[in-house]
C-alpha cells in the first residue's frame, strides 16, 4: 500500500506503483512513472518524462527531469530513466536528454549520488557508482559500472569514464579515462590503477596482466594509439586487451594520460 502525504501535488496522469512513499510538498508531473517501493522524501520535484525504478530513494529538494540546461533545447520529447535501488541525496539535479544527444539521460542500478550532484542532459551512467557531494557532470558524459568520483569534481561534456575507475576529489577532468584507472588533478591525469576496485572485481592473475598491459601502453614510444593497435594485433582474443585498447582507440577527446605522471605514481605504489 502506498503512503502519500496530503500536501503532495501529484498529477492524475502520473503512474504510481505499489508501496510507494511520497513525502510532504512533493511535486509530481504528468509523465512520471514511479515503480514499486520508490520513496520520495519531502520537497522532491519530478518533471518531464521521468521513470524511476524499484526501491529507489530520493531525498529532500532533489529536482529530477527538469528542463535541460542547454540553449539548443526547444521542448522536444526526451526522457530521464533511473534504474532500481538508487540513493539520490539532497539537492541533486538530473536533467533529461536532448535532440542533440540520445534524447535520454540514463542511470543504472544501485548508485549513490550524494548531495548537490548535477547530472546534465544525455549522460549515461552505469551501476554501482558512487558520486560524492558536489560532483558535476556536463552533457553527453558516459560512465561505466563501479566508478567512484570524489567530491567537488567537474567533468567536461562528452568525456567517457570506463568501468572501475576512481576520480579523486576536486579534480577537473577533460579527457577520457580507460578501465580501472585512477585520475587526479586540475587538469586531471591518470596517476595509476584503481587496485582497490580491481581486487573486488578481478582475480589476481588478471590484475597482474592489466598492470603489465598498461605499462606497455604508457611507454613514451610508440604513441598510446599505436601501442593500443599493436596490443590488439598481438592479443586479439584477450578480453582485457579488447576492453582497454578498444576504449583508447575509440576516444574522440583523447585519454587523460601523461607518461611521467603515470610512471611516478606507479613507482610510489610499488
From Swiss-Prot:
It catalyses: a (3R)-hydroxyacyl-[ACP] + UDP-N-acetyl-alpha-D-glucosamine = a UDP-3-O-[(3R)-3-hydroxyacyl]-N-acetyl-alpha-D-glucosamine + holo-[ACP]. Its EC number is 2.3.1.129. Keywords: Acyltransferase, Cytoplasm, Lipid A biosynthesis, Lipid biosynthesis, Lipid metabolism, Repeat, Transferase. It is found in: Cytoplasm. It comes from the Bacteria. One of its GO terms (cellular component) is membrane. Pfam families: Acetyltransf_11, Hexapep. It is an enzyme of class 2 (transferase). Pathway: Glycolipid biosynthesis; lipid IV(A) biosynthesis; lipid IV(A) from (3R)-3-hydroxytetradecanoyl-[acyl-carrier-protein] and UDP-N-acetyl-alpha-D-glucosamine: step 1/6. InterPro entries: Acetyltransf_C, Acetyltransf_C_sf, Hexapep, Lipid_A_LpxA, Trimer_LpxA-like_sf. Disulfide bonds: none annotated. One of its GO terms (biological process) is lipid A biosynthetic process. Its main location: cytoplasm. One of its GO terms (molecular function) is acyl-[acyl-carrier-protein]-UDP-N-acetylglucosamine O-acyltransferase activity. Involved in the biosynthesis of lipid A, a phosphorylated glycolipid that anchors the lipopolysaccharide to the outer membrane of the cell. Homotrimer. Belongs to the transferase hexapeptide repeat family. LpxA subfamily. This is Acyl-[acyl-carrier-protein]--UDP-N-acetylglucosamine O-acyltransferase. The lineage of its organism: Bacteria, Pseudomonadati, Campylobacterota, Epsilonproteobacteria, Campylobacterales.
Amino acid at each position: 500500500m502506498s503512503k502519500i502525504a496530503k500536501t503532495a501535488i501529484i498529477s492524475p496522469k502520473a503512474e504510481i506503483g505499489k508501496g510507494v512513499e511520497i513525502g510532504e510538498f512533493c511535486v509530481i508531473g504528468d509523465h512520471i512513472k514511479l515503480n514499486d517501493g520508490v520513496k520520495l522524501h519531502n520537497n522532491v520535484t519530478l518533471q518531464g518524462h521521468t521513470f524511476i525504478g524499484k526501491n529507489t530513494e530520493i531525498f529532500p529538494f532533489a529536482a529530477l527531469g527538469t528542463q535541460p540546461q542547454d540553449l539548443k533545447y526547444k521542448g522536444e520529447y526526451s526522457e530521464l530513466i533511473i534504474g532500481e535501488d538508487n540513493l539520490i541525496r539532497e539537492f541533486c539535479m538530473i536533467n533529461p536528454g536532448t535532440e542533440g544527444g540520445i534524447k535520454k539521460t540514463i542511470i543504472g542500478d544501485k548508485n549513490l549520488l550524494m548531495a548537490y550532484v548535477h547530472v546534465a542532459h544525455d549522460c549515461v551512467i552505469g551501476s554501482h557508482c558512487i558520486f560524492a557531494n558536489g560532483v558535476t557532470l556536463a552533457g553527453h558524459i558516459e560512465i561505466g559500472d563501479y566508478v567512484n568520483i570524489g567530491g567537488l569534481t567537474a567533468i567536461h561534456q562528452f568525456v567517457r569514464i570506463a568501468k572501475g575507475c576512481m576520480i579523486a576529489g576536486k579534480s577537473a577532468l577533460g579527457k577520457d579515462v580507460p578501465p580501472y584507472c585512477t585520475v587526479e588533478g586540475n587538469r586531471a591525469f591518470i596517476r595509476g590503477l584503481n587496485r582497490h576496485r580491481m581486487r573486488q572485481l578481478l582475480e589476481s592473475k588478471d590484475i597482474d596482466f592489466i598492470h603489465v598491459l598498461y605499462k606497455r601502453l604508457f611507454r613514451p614510444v610508440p604513441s598510446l594509439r599505436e601501442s593500443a593497435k599493436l596490443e590488439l594485433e598481438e592479443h586479439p582474443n584477450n578480453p582485457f586487451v579488447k576492453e582497454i585498447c578498444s576504449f583508447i582507440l575509440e576516444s574522440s577527446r583523447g585519454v587523460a594520460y601523461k607518461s611521467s605522471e603515470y610512471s611516478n605514481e606507479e613507482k610510489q605504489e610499488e
